[in-house]
A protein has these predicted regions:
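Surface-exposed, low-hydrophobicity beta-strand/loop segments enriched in small/polar/acidic residues
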Residues: 1-123
């Protein structure tokens, strides 16, 4: 008998809550002018829409984008999914905004830890 293993959900996602409808995840509206890929750390803008975490003053990381990439144009929103609570992630496999400092990445991980999204070492 041949068994074919499917693609893992994500290289950055070590564990999440089990159950119907994936309770760790939330559907989100992706803000305009975004390019989100699997494993991108996101925040929510003033309208509650997901955007790449940029580490600006008072910005709080709200989750990690999961699934197929979503690119939105100027003035156009999209649909996506984020891991928003209770999960274990491999920090070195997460995607941050290009040029984001290590200190701001650490701050984002601290925000995620408050949501019970914690880091583990890669195998």
């Amino acid at each position: 008998m041949t068994v074919t293993l499917g693609k893992p959900t994500s290289a950055w996602l070590a564990n999440e809550l089990d159950g119907n409808h994936r309770p760790s995840r939330e559907n989100v509206v992706v803000a305009a002018s975004q390019e989100l890929t699997d494993g991108t750390v996101v925040s929510l803008n003033a309208n509650g829409q997901a955007q790449i975490y940029a580490g600006v003053t008072d910005e709080v990381a709200a989750g990690i984008f999961v699934g197929d990439a979503v690119t939105t144009g100027a003035g156009v929103t999209g649909a996506g999914v984020i891991v928003a609570r209770t999960a274990k992630v491999v920090a070195e496999n997460l995607t941050f905004k290009s040029g984001l400092t290590t200190a701001k990445q650490t701050a984002a991980l601290a925000d995620l830890a408050k949501l019970h999204i914690t880091t583990v070492r890669s195998a």
